[in-house]
Amino acid sequence: MSRELHDVDLAEVKPLVEKGESITGLLQEFDVQEQDIETLHGSLHVTLCGTPKGNRPVILTYHDIGMNHKTCYNPLFNSEDMQEITQHFAVCHVDAPGQQDGAPSFPVGYMYPSMDQLAEMLPGVLHQFGLKSVIGMGTGAGAYILTRFALNNPEMVEGLVLMNVNPCAEGWMDWAASKISGWTQALPDMVVSHLFGKEEIHNNVEVVHTYRQHILNDMNPSNLHLFISAYNSRRDLEIERPMPGTHTVTLQCPALLVVGDNSPAVDAVVECNSKLDPTKTTLLKMADCGGLPQISQPAKLAEAFKYFVQGMGYMPSASMTRLMRSRTASGSSVTSLEGTRSRSHTSEGPRSRSHTSEGSRSRSHTSEDARLNITPNSGATGNNAGPKSMEVSC
């Protein structure tokens, strides 16, 4: 009996963004609570997705300027790769005052909270939902706010994923430039130049146009201007890399710093990495990625996030990712985000460490779609024992 061969269409069953779908598409189906929570410095619009599980932390997100939690994080949390993670953790999305969809304008004379005050509002959110601790995920301004929150309340923060974080106050040259650009540049253009690198603006016209339209049509312009002004008036976080025998201000929790290699925030993130505890910090540089890695490469970011929480002791039985499987099949040792690894530093001088007992660990896998190169940052102490912070390129 002869059998005919038929073409089978293996197109994606549910694309990340359907044609014509709004950028603020719905999250996956969860029990969702939306509340306006009164805090020490005013009201916050908060969305809790899922049910907190016992003593397990909740993922708490904070967005960047020109965005809200939907435009900043929906593509990531809607992605297939995040589904396993959100089965283990509830997610609490915080919108900065006046940045949520449909937000009314603040009255004339309203004093918008400073960045420090925005961080001081977060304990009230945890108390409202009965949460003991969180794993923070912040982008840009949101990353700064969550870092300040962790510095003020280390007992409430078990870990931080910080995208495009800038730990420094805006210099007077930057301040002057922002004032001048405010006179000559439309608000959407100012935000776009903050979110995207020049190359990305030129090459990803459709994505940039989508966000420009979101800023024009969905954001309250007066409220957005207040949030931008607060971010441009931020203080230096005044964090320092800890040294033996000294007392320094730094994060006490594990931190994953994330930046695209074409992001306008690369230098700021590298600067932040140099100020944190090298035994608790990982720097993830995403190749061929611009200013919004959670939008352009959600699968890679979800994978890195899974490694991160596994390093914290959660999700030990999580399934192996595509990258882990491909590396195992190729015969290479599987790398994690914890422990010592050899690396060369281009910015801090050569610090390659030989590990003769472990043999050669070649990290080049040109046959694979994704590469994960992990190497320790300088501990700045001269002591080679113990774990070092990592720099990851993927």
UniProtKB/Swiss-Prot annotation:
What are the GO cellular component annotations?
A: adherens junction; centrosome; cytoplasm; cytosol; microtubule; myelin sheath; nucleus; perinuclear region of cytoplasm
Phenotypic effect of disruption: Mutant mice exhibit defects in peripheral nerve development. Initial hind limb weakness developed around age 12 weeks, and significant functional impairment (dragging of hind legs) and muscle atrophy became apparent at age 1 year. After about 5 weeks extensive demyelination of nerve fibers is observed. In later life, large inclusions were seen in the adaxonal Schwann cell cytoplasm. There is no evidence of apoptotic response.
**PTM info:** Under stress conditions, phosphorylated in the C-terminal on many serine and threonine residues. Phosphorylated in vitro by PKA. Phosphorylation enhanced by increased intracellular cAMP levels. Homocysteine induces dephosphorylation. Phosphorylation by SGK1 is cell cycle dependent.
> Sorted alphabetically, which InterPro entries does this protein's record hold?
AB_hydrolase_fold, NDRG
* Residues bearing the modification N-acetylserine: 2
- Cystine pairs annotated here are none
Q: Where is this region: Disordered?
A: 325-394
Induction info: Repressed by testosterone and also to a lesser extent by dihydrotestosterone. Down-regulated by MYCN.
Q: Name one GO molecular function term.
A: gamma-tubulin binding
Q: What is its main location?
A: cytoplasm
Spans of biased composition, class Basic and acidic residues?
A: 345-371
Region (3 X 10 AA tandem repeats of G-[PST]-R-S-R-S-H-T-S-E): which ranges? 339-368
User: Where does this protein reside within or beyond the cell?
Assistant: Cytoplasm, Cytosol; Cytoplasm, Cytoskeleton, Microtubule organizing center, Centrosome; Nucleus; Cell membrane
Q: Which UniProt keywords apply?
A: Acetylation, Cell membrane, Cytoplasm, Cytoskeleton, Membrane, Microtubule, Nucleus, Phosphoprotein, Repeat
Residues with the modification Phosphoserine, per the entry, are: 2, 319, 326, 330, 332-333, 336, 342, 352, 362, 364
Residues recorded as bearing Phosphothreonine in the entry: 328, 335, 340, 346, 356, 366, 375
Top-level taxon of origin: Eukaryota
A biological process (GO) of this protein is: negative regulation of cell population proliferation
What are the Polar residues biased-composition ranges? 327-339, 374-386
State the tissue distribution. Widely expressed, with highest levels in kidney followed by brain, pancreas, small intestine, colon and spleen (at protein level). Also detected in heart and preputial gland, and in much smaller quantities in other tissues. Not detected in duodenum and prostate. Highly expressed in Schwann cells.
Q: What does this protein do, in the record's words?
A: Stress-responsive protein involved in hormone responses, cell growth, and differentiation. Acts as a tumor suppressor in many cell types. Necessary but not sufficient for p53/TP53-mediated caspase activation and apoptosis. Required for vesicular recycling of CDH1 and TF. May also function in lipid trafficking. Protects cells from spindle disruption damage. Functions in p53/TP53-dependent mitotic spindle checkpoint. Regulates microtubule dynamics and maintains euploidy.
Question: Can you state the subunit structure given in the record?
Answer: Interacts with RAB4A (membrane-bound form); the interaction involves NDRG1 in vesicular recycling of CDH1. Interacts with APOA1, APOA2, PRA1 and RTN1.
Family assignment?
A: Belongs to the NDRG family.
Protein name, entry field:
Protein NDRG1
Natural source organism: Mus musculus (Mouse)
